[in-house]
């Protein structure tokens, strides 16, 4: 930000001048002054040649001091001849009588309309002639296009763009020679020249705008019937930004290699007004366009102070990336204002009675919010037509904030919602009730699992005896004994223990069964291996070899195989 108290040198390219100060306007003014001088000289000659006769009425005027007696004058012959002599030679009286005798025009005359119409036609012809003469004097390329220069490392202030450069692509003398007869318009001056609502091109035969490249897009194609290549890059002076569109295959191939941070001059670009889609027919701002094949961009040097805003967006987790002047600022204007508001909110003496209200609609943008596009500085707020019902509905649904608390939370990171603090006791009570219900459910689950594990309390004596006989018959098969573990997880022992104890077994068979059951119940194996043993593996291998020798071996060395082996066992 420039300090108004600082005394700076006069910059001729920073002052906004009128369009009449160009060379053609000065030449026309000199021509008009020459014609005026000639007219005045001729008028002076006529005045000198013609001597105005004296009026006899003013030769001798006598004012009587007091009333006198009226006397009858006797006219003489000489006096009559003298009066007739001067009557015909009085030019003033003759001219006055002629003007009085002319008929006056009626009140409803069209003389003013006709004069205005004729003047309009004359002005139009003058504008056409002026435009033709301006186009005849226009050039489309710089005079240094065919020369090749070696970049020069430097650290100086470039006079045409008022930007510091660390490298020059063209010497300063050659640059001044190339831009000698070209009007230089910086971005601030260009926005003052190209004004709404018409956004007409500046009235200069040759003009160029200067700035540094801060953004460059990818190559795209237009959506017309015959697609055309184009790309866009943005130039800036750290205060204003402007988009430049390059159309055409040759232009894209020539200018797509422009580097970010280069200071360039664009000669006589076309002004391209644009309007936002779906927001009426009014023109909002303008861009620049190059659609011809001439080389009209001159690379001056590489900027020294170009940088990017390093502030990270909390939602997207990406850096801001807005171009900044690293010699003056550490972040962009938007984040500087956010930091200023965060700092001023902590100081009571800086807080006013009324704060800047947060936007409730998309169209209402306070000074804190930067426009979404990069031409936010050039917003033209004009009258808009009434929107349709569907557009009004979409407009109402596009709110930035749901309520005022959300807006305050957006501006202040330490903001606490008062509604949340008021309901804090209710939330704490709900959390305690949830913990108690979870503990109660856990205890009830333990009790239910304990009752389901036994399941013999509600059984009758007959049912218990039946379950015992079924369990003993299952144990007699030896399947569970070969497994090496209890698959029922102890339920067999509970069934056998809870059954009715009868008399001692009458025969040895029942005693043996009881002994086997007890051994099985008390049998525990530390490591259970379900894979076949080594002996079983060797038996299978030898059996496989015997079968192979039988069918594919030599007939002399036939070996008899076991009768239990079959051809189906060959893999």
Curated annotation (Swiss-Prot):
Q: Which GO terms describe its biological process?
A: DNA replication initiation; DNA strand elongation involved in DNA replication; double-strand break repair via break-induced replication; mitotic DNA replication; silent mating-type cassette heterochromatin formation; subtelomeric heterochromatin formation
Provide this UniProt record's keywords sorted from A to Z: Cell cycle, DNA replication, Metal-binding, Nucleus, Phosphoprotein, Ubl conjugation, Zinc, Zinc-finger
Domain of life, per lineage? Eukaryota
Provide the residue span(s) of the region labelled Sufficient for nuclear localization. 435-512, 453-553
**Modification sites for Phosphothreonine:** 17
| Primary location recorded for the protein, binned into one broad class | nucleus
Report the outcome of residue 332 to G: Abolishes self-association
Q: Region annotation Zinc finger-like: residue ranges?
A: 309-335
List every position bearing Phosphoserine: 18, 453-454
Record note on what altering residue 269 to L does: In mcm10-1; diminishes interaction with MCM7
CDD domains on file? RPA2_OBF_family
According to the UniProt entry, its GO molecular function terms are: DNA replication origin binding; double-stranded DNA binding; single-stranded DNA binding; zinc ion binding
Effect of changing residue 320 to Y: reported as: In mcm10-43; abolishes self-association and diminishes interaction with MCM7
Q: How is it modified after translation?
A: Diubiquitinated in a cell cycle-regulated manner. Ubiquitination first appears in late G(1) and persists throughout S phase.
A Pfam match is MCM10_OB
Q: What is the effect of changing residue 261 to A/D?
A: Temperature sensitive; loss of CDC17 stabilization
Which SUPFAM superfamilies does this chain map to? Nucleic acid-binding proteins (SSF50249)
Protein purpose: Required for DNA synthesis. Required for entry into or completion of S phase. Involved in DNA replication and seems to participate in the activation of the pre-replication complex (pre-RC) and in transcription elongation. May play a role as a key coordinator in assembling the replication fork. Proposed to function at replication origins following the binding of the MCM2-7 complex prior to the recruitment of CDC45. Probably is required to stimulate phosphorylation of the MCM2-7 complex by the CDC7-DBF4 kinase complex.
Q: What is known of its domains?
A: The zinc finger-like domain binds a zinc ion and is involved in self-association.
Which protein family is it in? Belongs to the MCM10 family.
Q: What is its quaternary makeup?
A: Self-associates; assembles into large homomultimeric complexes of approximately 800 kDa. Associates with the MCM2-7 complex and the DNA polymerase alpha:primase complex. Interacts with ORC1, ORC2, MCM2, MCM3, CDC54/MCM4, MCM6, CDC47/MCM7, RFA2, CDC45, POL1, PRI2, POL12, SIR2 and SIR3. The diubiquitinated form interacts with POL30/PCNA C-terminus.
List the protein's name: Minichromosome maintenance protein 10
- Species this chain originates from: Saccharomyces cerevisiae (strain ATCC 204508 / S288c) (Baker's yeast)
Q: Which gene encodes it?
A: MCM10
